Every structure is written in structure tokens, then in C-alpha cells.
A protein has these predicted regions:
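A domain-start/cap signature at the N-terminus of enzymes
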Residues: 16-58, 92, 133, 138, ...
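Gly/Ser-rich "nucleophile elbow"/oxyanion-hole loop immediately N-terminal to the catalytic nucleophile
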Residues: 47-54, 102-135, 148-150
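Sec-dependent N-terminal signal peptides
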Residues: 4-14
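Alpha-helical scaffolding within the catalytic cores
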Residues: 72-85, 113, 138-141, 161-175, ...
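C-terminal catalytic histidine-bearing segment of alpha/beta-hydrolase fold enzymes
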Residues: 43, 181-185, 191-245
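Primarily recognizes the serine-hydrolase "nucleophile elbow" in alpha/beta-hydrolase
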Residues: 119-120, 126-176
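Active-site machinery of serine-nucleophile hydrolases
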Residues: 58, 62-113
Length: 245
């Protein structure tokens, strides 16, 4: 994805309102030096329209490399979009963008999308949560550390990242980093992204002074450490325990 420059023109194409356990297909068009379409799935809690004064917690979900492309149905195969598609009701706004083929997650594009959706759909900006798997796990570490003041908690799954970003984030906004909820997940037998990647990121945060980054390791799991994680109600309870002051 191309870097977004300071002046942005945002054009939004919205495919209707979501009701009950339904997620809609949407597109954000960002015009800078080139026009970039950001396609995403949007889920709104069933009471969203009935409670126009309420601010809602929001989850930004980043898929893995295998779901890249221009078919949003691919994004529904894992994570919160999968749960919603199966009819599970969630008490969060869920935003699930699709990364174009051949590209990786871009922090500026994601923040632009997050800002637009949060404003348009009455998200509680003190309860923004970030999670992703594999390539999305890397994206979660990157976006979560670069913009640690924006998120209340992050949950990277079978990911890793540039540990220098942890130091840079701390230098820029140490208090925000140290109050960011962090819960990482990984399979001990992952042949694609070694467990050492998550361990290194968690260890780096501890060295920097983060009081409690968590790491859950599934002893027998290989690369798929996300199915069990996203099916666990405790993850969503943990998200809601964190609020950005």
C-alpha cells in the first residue's frame, strides 16, 4: 500500500446499515498521489440503530496473507468476521479491512479507515481494540505500537514485528505504551512464524517497562493459533476490561 500523505480526500461508499448479526461490504477511497480503494467488512451490534446516543467499543481485525485480494468473502474465513457470518452476535463494532494482493498492512491507511468508521458509526474512542493473525499479527504489532495512544488493547496472534518500534513508541509516548493492554497468542509448533517472534516482542515490552504484556502459548498448536483464540469469550471480556484514559 502507498503511504498516505498529509492532505487526504475521503470518499465513502456505504452498502447500507448492518442489523443483527450481519456485516456489510464497504469501501473507503483515499486520494493522495494515487487513488486507493480500501474494502472492508463492517458489523454493527444489533442495538446500534436503536441506541443513537450510545458509543460502542470497536474491534479492528487484520487478516492473514492468504486472505489478500479483492473478494471480501475471503475475509470471512477466520476471526471475528467468521463468527459474525455464523450468526454470533457481538457487542462491538467490527471493522475487517482487506489488504490488496501483493501488499502488506499499511499503518496510515488503517488509521485513516479507523478514524472514518469511528466517527461515522459512533465508536467509543476510549475503547478501540486491535487484533490480527499471521500477517495481521505483524500488522497488529506494527499499528498497535506506532499508534499506542489510540488503542486500549491489542491481541496479536502468531505474529511478530520490529522490536525497535516498541522503543520508538515508548520514546514518543511512554505512558500510552505502558498502559496499552497486550495479549499475544502463538502455537509452540508454528512452522510458519516461529514462537520466538512473539516471545521477542513481549520480552522487549517488559524491558521497556511495560507492566504486564501477556503471552499465551498453545503447546500442540502449529500455525493456526487463531481459531481457539477467537472462539474464546475471555478474549472479548479482556478487551472490555481495558479503556484508554
Amino acid at each position: 500500500m502507498k503511504r498516505i500523505f498529509p492532505i487526504l480526500i475521503l470518499v465513502i461508499a456505504i452498502a447500507g446499515q448492518a442489523t443483527a448479526a450481519v456485516q456489510t461490504q464497504n469501501k473507503l477511497i483515499v486520494k493522495s498521489k494515487r487513488e486507493l480503494d480500501v474494502k472492508y467488512l463492517l458489523y454493527l451490534p444489533k442495538d446500534h440503530a436503536a441506541k443513537p446516543e450510545k458509543k460502542w467499543p470497536l474491534i479492528l481485525f487484520l487478516h492473514g496473507a492468504g486472505e489478500r485480494g479483492d473478494d471480501l468473502n475471503r475475509v470471512k474465513v477466520h476471526g471475528p468476521p467468521k463468527l459474525v457470518e455464523k450468526g454470533e452476535a457481538m457487542e462491538f463494532i467490527v471493522v475487517s479491512p482487506q489488504c490488496p494482493k501483493g501488499m502488506v498492512w499499511n499503518d496510515e491507511v488503517l488509521i485513516t479507515l479507523l478514524d472514518d468508521v469511528a466517527k461515522r458509526y459512533r465508536a467509543d474512542v476510549t475503547r478501540l481494540y486491535l487484533t490480527g493473525l499471521s500477517m495481521g499479527g505483524y500488522g497488529t504489532w506494527s499499528l498497535g505500537l506506532t499508534h499506542c495512544d489510540r488503542f486500549a488493547a491489542i491481541a496479536p496472534i502468531c505474529g511478530g514485528g520490529d522490536f525497535i518500534k516498541a522503543y520508538n513508541a515508548g520514546d514518543a509516548n511512554g505512558k500510552a505504551l505502558k498502559t496499552l493492554g497486550v495479549w499475544a497468542f502463538h502455537g509452540a509448533k508454528d512452522p510458519v512464524v516461529p514462537l520466538a517472534e512473539s516471545k521477542r516482542m513481549v520480552a522487549t515490552l517488559k524491558k521497556f517497562g511495560h507492566p504486564g504484556p501477556k503471552l499465551t502459548v498453545y503447546p500442540e498448536a502449529k500455525h493456526d493459533s487463531w481459531t481457539k483464540t477467537y472462539a474464546n469469550p475471555e478474549l472479548y471480556k479482556w478487551f472490555l476490561q481495558h479503556q484508554r484514559k
